[in-house]
Amino acid sequence: MTKTQLHLNNFLTLAQEAGSLPKLAKLCGYRTPVALYKLKQRLEKQAEDPDARGIRPSLMAKLEKHTGKPKGWLDRKHRERTVPETAAESTGTAETRIAETASAAGCRSVTVNRNTCETQITVSINLDGSGKSRLDTGVPFLEHMIDQIARHGMIDIDISCKGDLHIDDHHTAEDIGITLGQAIRQALGDKKGIRRYGHSYVPLDEALSRVVIDLSGRPGLVYNIEFTRTLIGRFDVDLFEEFFHGIVNHSMMTLHIDNLSGKNAHHQAETVFKAFGRALRMAVEHDPRMAGQTPSTKGTLTA
């Protein structure tokens, strides 16, 4: 086993114990998980190289410190073990299991189950669907917006969520975004033959929004919306940003959202979600001229 392979195995163990890679990033003081996703990709790419340096000492010390591991833990081989589901549940926030399965070979359809002490979610999507949706989340206005993604993206979306709505809608909105992002990433597979980029302008009366997507494997959200009020019905508009952060970080897409005008908050939100659906439809579509090629001079969009 190379040094890099050893570091990778131990790094993945830390992520599993934390509940997920984004939660490990938060534990270690990162604002977003992008740096740790890039570290994972580099370790995977260099795993078989005996001369690769693995994780640099300063980052190794940071990971060990924030996860309560002794100094040098990442440099040592440990007996493989699985985090018990009951132990994960006892933390109150840990992600207990993520199950992702394609329904058939070559079919861009997937079901993801994500269960925590805050939410229990099942998301099924078909990127080559007809725009149907079946939504049971307990948050009516969020369902109305996700229905726009399905209808305008021509993506079939089925979401069932039982969340801690007695507290508020925050965990439900964020975790649905996370799980939907995981489903998009899994359904896309190696991304060969897709257009990769998508964009859309959508108006609704006085409101106009622009959404641009790059399915690059590089998560990043630029979010420019100044809603004219803080609540639409009883839904807190701040949660839209949490929803899109979840999608971005777990689908590994770059997403720019700009509401260019609008006075009615409902119209502002609806133009954003319709534009997102249409931009996503464009980005995930197969380009017949690509003939199964990866739309990148790098040769991959998953490493």
UniProtKB/Swiss-Prot annotation:
One example GO MF annotation: imidazoleglycerol-phosphate dehydratase activity
The keyword Cytoplasm is annotated on this UniProt entry: yes
Pathway where it operates: Amino-acid biosynthesis; L-histidine biosynthesis; L-histidine from 5-phospho-alpha-D-ribose 1-diphosphate: step 6/9
Main subcellular location of this protein, as a coarse class: cytoplasm
EC numbers, comma separated: 4.2.1.19
Keyword Amino-acid biosynthesis on entry: yes
CDD domains referenced in this protein's UniProt entry, alphabetically: IGPD
Keywords from the named record: Amino-acid biosynthesis, Cytoplasm, Histidine biosynthesis, Lyase
Family from the record: Belongs to the imidazoleglycerol-phosphate dehydratase family.
Protein name: Imidazoleglycerol-phosphate dehydratase
